[in-house]
From Swiss-Prot:
GO terms for molecular function: mRNA binding; rRNA binding; structural constituent of ribosome; tRNA binding. Keywords: Ribonucleoprotein, Ribosomal protein, RNA-binding, rRNA-binding, tRNA-binding. This is Small ribosomal subunit protein uS7. It comes from Coxiella burnetii (strain RSA 493 / Nine Mile phase I). GO terms for biological process: ribosomal small subunit assembly; translation. Pfam families: Ribosomal_S7 (PF00177). The keyword Lipid biosynthesis does not apply. Residues 56-80 are annotated as: Disordered. InterPro entries: Ribosomal_uS7, Ribosomal_uS7_bac/org-type, Ribosomal_uS7_CS, Ribosomal_uS7_dom, Ribosomal_uS7_dom_sf. One of the primary rRNA binding proteins, it binds directly to 16S rRNA where it nucleates assembly of the head domain of the 30S subunit. Is located at the subunit interface close to the decoding center, probably blocks exit of the E-site tRNA. One of its GO terms (cellular component) is ribosome.
Length: 191
């Protein structure tokens, strides 16, 4: 048992553009080496690509890749202008992001429990804060593993894939659920 008392929960300030605490935490998950402004550009750029793709799909069923601009820097600058000014695009992007996060969130996971000399993988239900943390972590991890040219496009396509029920993060969630289902017989060992 830990001898210290539990650390107090710190409140997260909402992000400046969407005023969403969920998105602020996601920006922090994308951030590396304390470079928050870079992480914000990546996330906002990805959400802009997501908004354009969803608008094109619902509107004209066009290609709407956002990749036709040539250099990746051009995409970032153009996308930041669009998402900062267009309220509908902002709402659409946020809803799509929340939908992706909901689909990636796992419900159960397995934890090791030692009973009488043997170790069992015991399925346990996950509390909401950990579900969200795992979903954020998996989205960023599997976006990094993609082959697109820039992180903006990798993250955007991972979010879009998650909404449609495919992609690396969704596969990870299914693997975790499959593992829990396979070890359901040991559920009575939970603590």
């Amino acid at each position: 048992m830990a001898r210290r008392k539990a650390a107090p929960k710190r409140e997260t300030l909402p992000d400046p553009l969407f005023h969403s605490e969920l998105l602020a935490k996601f920006i922090n998950a994308v951030m590396r080496n304390g470079k928050k402004s870079v992480a914000e550009k990546i996330v906002y750029g990805a959400l802009d690509v997501v908004a354009k793709r969803v608008q094109n799909k619902s509107g004209e069923q066009g290609d709407g890749d956002g990749e036709s601009g040539g250099k990746a820097g051009g995409i970032k600058k153009r996308s930041l202008g669009d998402i900062r000014t267009d309220e509908n695009a902002r709402a659409l992007a946020l809803e799509t992001f929340k939908g992706a996060l909901d689909k990636v969130m796992p419900n159960v996971e397995v934890k090791s429990r030692r009973v009488g000399g043997s170790t069992y993988q015991v399925p346990v239900e996950i509390r909401m804060a950990r579900r969200q943390a795992l979903a954020r972590r998996w989205l960023v991890e599997y976006a990094n593993k993609r082959n697109e040219k820039t992180m903006v496009l990798r993250l955007a396509h991972e979010i879009l894939d998650a909404v449609e029920g495919r992609g690396g993060a969704i596969k990870k969630r299914e693997d975790v659920h499959r593992m829990a289902k396979a070890n359901q017989a040991f559920a009575h060992y939970k603590w």
